């Protein structure tokens, strides 16, 4: 695969715009603004966005839009059974899963064991303290969780407007069925 051939990529100056590339996040910020202006009549209304998320990429763009001043009340993070992010927002514990612990689900785009964009939010949460983020991620890179539950940082999370939840396969199917029956 070309994306894994580093010599070829360097020789031909090829890059990717995947979910961890800052250019993609910046591009996604735009549609939070577009969505806001499409959903509101005045510029002082607050909105909330619900975002299915495994890698924290799209919702990170929402976080950036909010930091830029877009009046977002809540960013609702929805995960599947691989609930690493939901666990963090509920408990303050970030515990990436091993490959063996990561479940294969009916929503495979969220079958993520370690959210590669999450570090960006933690950087903001720590008041952009690069040393603290480096220490936290050193633990993660060694396969250990980090726990912010007993710290002022955990209480500060609510200031960013995040709400989270997870679903399982039967709940997703029931929701799809209900929406189809009621709105088709």
Predicted segments — roles?
Residues 1-184:
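PLP-dependent amino-acid enzyme catalytic core
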């Amino acid at each position: 695969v070309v994306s894994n051939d580093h010599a070829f990529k360097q020789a031909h100056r090829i890059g990717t715009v995947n979910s961890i590339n800052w250019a993609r996040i910046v591009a996604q910020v735009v549609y939070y603004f577009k969505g806001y202006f499409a959903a509101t009549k005045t510029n002082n209304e607050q909105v909330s966005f619900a975002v299915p998320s495994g890698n924290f990429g799209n919702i990170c763009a929402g976080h950036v839009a909010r930091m830029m001043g877009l009046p977002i009340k809540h960013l609702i993070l929805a995960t599947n059974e691989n609930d690493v992010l939901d666990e963090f927002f509920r408990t303050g514990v970030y515990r990436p899963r091993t490959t063996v612990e990561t479940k294969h689900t009916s929503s495979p785009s969220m079958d993520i064991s370690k959210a590669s964009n999450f570090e960006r939010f933690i950087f903001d949460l720590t008041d952009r303290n690069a040393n603290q983020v480096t220490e936290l991620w050193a633990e993660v890179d060694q396969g250990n969780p980090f726990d912010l539950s007993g710290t002022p940082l955990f209480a500060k999370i609510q200031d960013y407007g995040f709400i989270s939840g997870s679903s399982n396969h039967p709940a997703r199917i029931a929701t799809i069925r209900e929406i189809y029956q009621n709105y088709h």
